[in-house]
Curated annotation (Swiss-Prot):
Alphabetized PANTHER family for the sequence: AN1-TYPE ZINC FINGER PROTEIN 4 (PTHR46728:SF1)
AN1-type zinc finger segments: 673-720
UniProt: Zn(2+) 2 binding residues: 694, 696, 710, 712
Chain intervals for the UniProt region annotation (Disordered): 246-270, 287-316
Protein name as annotated: AN1-type zinc finger protein 4
Any Pfam family the entry gives: ubiquitin
Recorded coiled-coil stretches: none
Gene: Zfand4
Keyword Endoplasmic reticulum: no
Keywords: Metal-binding, Zinc, Zinc-finger
Gene Ontology molecular function, alphabetical: zinc ion binding
Compositionally biased region (Basic residues): 246-255
Gene3D superfamilies: AN1-like Zinc finger, Phosphatidylinositol 3-kinase Catalytic Subunit, Chain A, domain 1
Keyword Metal-binding: yes
Length: 739
């Protein structure tokens, strides 16, 4: 009966026997009363004396702690039985640990020197397998160590059978970690602590660090390169798709010109150059106000033209200082995009102060171009002086002769007395810095080239009804000009083709440089005249060079005005052109442009200018293809704006009988923009699925498509009545005779 009870509470027989032997030894020492073994079962019972008890604390891995009152001489198996009765945990799944040592069932608490108030660790070995030790809230190094120890479980499983329960214990003492394995033998007993594995946290990854990471094989390198190339191609394709759908919008800074003349120079110049620092894609350096922009200008210019004619200054010195800043900034912009610019020493009749006054007048006109785009136009010189014209383009070419000089752009701008109305010059200086002109990958050092944008205004009588009445070229007074110029028709002088009158045309630029694309913009109306025509020259072309402006952005009203202007230009003389509002609208359209096209900053489309070889072929083809009267109003639309030009001759040739020819229509560079539908009421964009046509003929969005939502003007009642009448015609049956 006693053995059955022992088996019921989970105490094995051999454990009971060993415990009996130990108790007998204690009895021999006479420290305890006699102990009767289980063999002497009889009616005699001995009452054990009462011993003092003590309280122990049992703590689980989950942090739960409870009290347990036990005797110091109580066996560990008895303590586990009490835990089973208290918590319901089977004895075979309990493991009590004290001082990093598991308590064996056969020994009592006194053998381990467990006293009052001690805390025992209770570890459970469940039938489903060991509890993961990572549930204990430990630091990251300990968690990584537990993962490392989990990987070594395979070796432990090989040593044990599959039907045994194994528990892994990890304890930390400072930086030292101890790893224990407890195996359930299957017969209710557990193995003692075995195969202890300990080590420091700091030398956990020493072996891993020593092992070099294996280098990828050649096949993997090839596959990686192929994948990388595919990703690059895909990225480029996606960028092209995005560019084709939505062109990048560049911030456009539209300056507001002042309404009154500027009284001082220091504050306004500083404000203007603060604006110039903000503008994108100009120079790399910020330009301070004052005369310190180009020190080489003052050193290399020699005697100043202003010093040669001090009595002819029309404006004050303060205004001149301000205009010097503008002039220096213009020349600096040109030097960034092309090459070094040098003013020829023969230009003796030019006044820098007057020229800078012209630059200031550009900023006074409301329809003027933006401050970022400056035109360098020169005054009319004497007949024996050489002319050098600068044409920034996509390619570099040097032509030999200039038959008809380019007429710079200026607009009618009445300020001062009529006696001051004369041809002007803007932004002339002598600059000789050298800077690299990069093309492709190699940097080319551009040599000093005598470059200047000289616009020549040929003489006309003051009585002409032109837009501007010009005085003689020898006048020193310069007119305040705006960026639009209409030149009076004049006859070509024979001295233009003399050797000493040969003009050099230097076209330079870099397609890859952004500064060359943002240098100049021109809005000009130029005339093409032959030597045989003195007063009967016609407008042969209207050219609006607005780089970066897409052709489809131009409003319909402006396009219609340009067409009408082109038709009138081929028929009327220059004196009849009085459409100043149209010219101002052209200037406004040009001032809105802030981008330069990739083809260069400005183009010269004058008739008698020798250009590069490919452009000469283009001129010859235009002359061959065009007929005398079939195309009087041909003009072309391009990404650079709306342009019309007369027929161009090859270099060194005069324009004779082909003055009435116009080039064929040039195809637009960009495809027509897809017209987006908008709601007639709210103006919201509507797509394919959100566009609704009403019976009133307008397009509406989803919320305004109903008749009551947009106040439809369609007469639904009369339409419905008419539909009912057509669907249900009135039938009059013959009357039946009465019987």
């Amino acid at each position: 009966m006693f053995k059955a009870d022992l088996g019921r509470i989970g105490i094995q027989l051999h454990t009971t026997y060993s415990r009996r032997i130990r108790k007998v030894k204690v009895m021999d020492n006479r420290k305890e009363p006699p102990f009767f073994n289980e063999d002497n079962v009889g009616p005699f019972y001995f009452k054990l004396p009462f011993y003092d008890t003590m309280e122990l604390f049992i703590e689980t891995l989950t942090g739960t702690c409870f009290e347990l009152r036990v005797s110091p001489f109580e066996a560990v198996i008895s303590v586990k039985g009490k835990i089973q009765r208290l918590e319901g945990i089977p004895i075979c799944q309990q493991h009590l640990i004290w001082n990093n040592m598991e308590l064996e069932d056969d020994y009592c608490l006194n053998d381990y020197n467990i006293s009052e108030g001690c805390t025992l660790k209770l570890v459970l070995a469940m039938r489903g397998g060991p509890i993961s030790t990572r549930k204990v809230p430990v630091e990251d190094p300990l968690r990584e160590l537990a993962e490392y120890m989990d990987s070594s479980r395979d070796e432990v499983w090989e040593k044990t059978s599959c039907n045994k329960q194994v528990t892994f214990l990890v304890y930390r003492e400072g930086d030292q970690l101890n790893f224990f394995r407890v195996v359930d033998r299957g017969d209710g007993t557990l193995t003692p602590l075995s195969e202890s594995l300990s080590g420091s946290v700091y030398n956990l990854y020493t072996d891993e660090d020593e092992e070099a990471e294996p280098s990828p094989s050649g096949q993997q390198i090839i596959e990686n390169s192929i994948t990388m190339n595919k990703m690059k191609l895909l990225k480029a394709k996606m960028e092209n798709m995005n560019l084709s759908k939505k062109p990048k919008k560049v911030v456009k800074v539209k300056p507001r010109p002042p309404l009154a003349p500027r009284p001082t120079s220091s504050s306004t110049a500083a404000a203007r150059h603060r604006l110039l620092r903000v503008l994108p894609h100009i120079g790399q350096s910020c330009l301070p106000s004052g005369n310190a922009h180009l020190p080489e200008t003052s050193r290399n210019a020699g005697p100043s033209p202003a010093a040669q004619a001090p009595a002819d200054r029309p404006v004050s010195s303060l205004r001149n200082e301000l205009l010097k800043d503008d002039d220096n900034w213009e020349i600096n912009m040109l030097s960034h995009s092309t090459s070094s610019i040098r003013l020829l020493p023969q230009l003796t009749h030019i006044e820098l102060e007057s020229d800078k006054e012209l630059a200031d007048s550009v900023l006074h006109l409301g329809s003027s171009l933006s401050r970022r785009t400056k035109h360098l136009s020169g005054n009319l010189l004497s007949n024996n002086e050489d002319d050098v014209v600068l044409f920034p383009r996509s390619e570099e070419c040097v032509a030999d002769e200039l038959l008809l000089p380019e007429v710079g752009a200026f607009a009618p701008f009445a300020e001062g007395t009529g006696a001051e109305q004369s041809s002007g010059v803007e932004g002339l200086g002598k600059v000789t810095p050298e800077f690299p002109l990069t093309k492709g990958d190699g940097g080319l050092r551009a040599a000093e080239q005598p470059l200047s944008h000289v616009a020549r205004v040929l003489s006309s009588e003051p009585g002409d009804n032109a837009v501007l009445n010009h005085r003689e070229p020898s006048s020193h007074k310069n007119r305040l000009l705006s960026p639009l110029l209409c030149a009076a028709p004049v006859s070509l002088h024979n001295s233009l083709v003399k050797p000493q009158r040969q003009s050099k045309c230097f076209e330079s630029g870099n397609p890859s440089a952004s500064t060359s694309q943002n240098t100049l913009r021109e809005l000009d109306i130029r005339t093409i005249a032959d030597s045989s025509f003195s007063r009967t020259a016609r407008f042969r072309g209207v050219k609006v060079d607005s780089p970066g402006k897409r052709s489809d952005i131009i409003s319909k009203v402006e396009a219609r005005d340009i067409t009408e202007m082109a038709n009138k230009a081929s028929k009327e003389p220059v004196g009849c052109v009085n459409n100043n509002g149209f010219l101002a609208s052209l200037a406004r359209s040009a001032s809105r442009d802030s981008l330069q096209s990739t083809h260069g900053a400005c183009r010269l489309r004058s008739s008698g200018i020798g250009l590069s070889t490919n452009f000469q072929h283009f001129q010859d083809e235009n002359i061959r293809k065009s007929s005398p009267q079939s195309e009087p109003t041909d003009f072309f639309l391009s990404a650079r704006g709306i342009g019309m030009s007369g027929s161009n001759a090859a270099a060194g040739k005069r324009i004779g009988e082909s003055i009435h020819h116009l080039p064929p229509v040039k195809a637009p560079l960009q495809t027509k923009k897809k017209i987006m539908k908008h709601c007639f009421l709210c103006g919201k964009k509507t797509g394919l699925a959100t566009s609704f046509e009403c019976r009133c003929g307008n397009n509406f969005c989803a919320s305004h498509r109903y008749a009551e939502a947009h106040g439809c003007t369609y007469d639904y009642k009369s339409a419905g009545r008419r539909y009912l009448e057509e669907a249900n015609p009135v039938v009059n049956a013959p009357k039946l005779p009465k019987i």
